[in-house]
Amino acid sequence: DSSTSRGLGDVYKRQETNSLPGKSNIAVLTIDFTFSTTNLKQIPMDKSKVFFTNLHTTPSSNLLDKRERLIKRAGIESIDFKDQFVAIKIHFGEPGNLAYLRPNYAARLATLLRSWGAKPFLTDCNTLYSGRRANAVDHLQSAMENGYNPISAQCQVIIADGLKGTEYREIPLNGEYCKAPKIGSALADADIVISMTHFKGHEQAGFGGALKNLGMGGASVGGKLELHCNSQPKIETENCKGCNICVKHCAHDAIHLNQNHKAEIDYTKCVGCGQCVALCQHDAAVMGECDTSERLNYKIAEYTQAILKDKPHFHISFIMNVSPECDCWNHNDAAIIPDLGILASFDPVALDKACADMVIAAPAINGSCLTEKHPHEHLEGADKFHLMHPDTNWQAGLEHAQKIGLGVMQYELITV
C-alpha cells in the first residue's frame, strides 16, 4: 500500500526463481523496506538491482572466484574499460586495524580490469586527523604494511590528493550543502570509478558503506574539513610553533603571524578551504565546530555525487568483519554480526540500503560490544548502527542521496 509508511524493521520478502536462457536458475529476493520518516509518494517506483553472493566456498570455487562471478553477473562488463584510467577506491586500513579488506580482492579485480584493457590503480585520500595516513609518505607506508603495494595488489597505489592533501579538483555541483566539493585529483581525473568497501559501523555516519567510502574517503583534506565542520578552522595557539607554513600557503592571504609569532586567522578573508589544517604539522590549525550526523551524511552524499558525476561507476561491498567503528582507528573491536557475503551494484544508494537491511536482519554475536551494551534486548531486526552510535542518523544520508538523484533506496536483491 503506497499510501502508508512501514515502520523500521517491517521487512516484506518474496522468494522467486527466474529461469534465464542459457543460465542456471537465479534466486531473486525482493525486499521492500522503507522508513516511517520517508514520504513514500516521493520515492521512485523503479528499483535498482543489487547482486549478492554468500561466503560458502568449494575447492573449485573460492571467494575470489565467487566475487568475480558476482560482479560479472551484476553487469560490470557493460562498461567499456579499454585504455581507461580506473580508480579503485579502497580504504587501506590504519596500521593496527585488521578488519580492512585483504589486498587479494584488489589484486584479482585489477588483474581482471587489465584483461579488459583498463589501466587500474588503487587510491584513497589523506586523512584530516593525525595518524599514519595524514600525508602521502606515511599513507603509502601504512598501505604497504597492510599488504597494499604494486606487487601484491597487481596495480599502482596512488594517494589521490597528493603529498600533503592539497592536490584536488573543485567539482562544480551547486548542491544544497556543498557548492564545489574538493575531490582528490587522481580520483577526479580518473575515467571510471569502482568502489570496493568494507561495510562496518561508523561513529559519526552510523555506518561506513559505499557512500562513506567515496564521499568522505575521496575528499581531499580540505574537503574533509568541509564535510565535518559547519565553521571555519581555528588556531590552537599553544600548539603553534610560528613555522609560517600556513601563512605561505594560504591562497586567500587570510593568515598572519602576530607579535608573539603565533598564527592568526583573518575571518573576513578566510573561505574555510582547510589547507592550513592539511599543512600544519603541529596540530595548531584545527577544525572548527563539527556538524551533526545528519548534515555530515547529507554532505557525504553530495561529495559522492561530485566524484561520480559524468563517469561510469560500479560498487562492491563486503559484509565481513563488521566492526562497530571505522577502519580509520588503529584497532578493531570484535565483529557485531556474523559474516554475510559480498554485494555489487551500479547504484551505491541501493547497495548501502541492502547492506544496512542485511545487517539489521542478522543476529548479533554474543560477546561483542553490541550485546554487552544491550544484553537484554532482542537484536535480530534491530537497528544495530543506531544502538551502537545513538547520535547518528544513517537514514538521512540515503534519503538525501535519493533526493539528489544519486540512486534509489528501493532495490531487488538477486542472489548469485
State where each predicted segment sits.
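Single conserved hydrophobic/aromatic residue that forms the stacking wall/gate
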Residues: D1-Q15
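N-terminal non-cleavable signal-anchor helices
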Residues: Y12, A27-L29, A350
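Short hydrophobic transmembrane-like helices used for membrane targeting/insertion
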Residues: I26-I31, I43
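Aromatic (phenylalanine/tyrosine) cluster motif
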Residues: F33-F35
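Extended, low-polarity segments enriched in aliphatic/aromatic residues
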Residues: D46-N97, L101-Y105, W116-D124, Y129-V416
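Active-site cofactor/substrate anionic-group-binding motifs, chiefly glycine-
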Residues: A107, L112
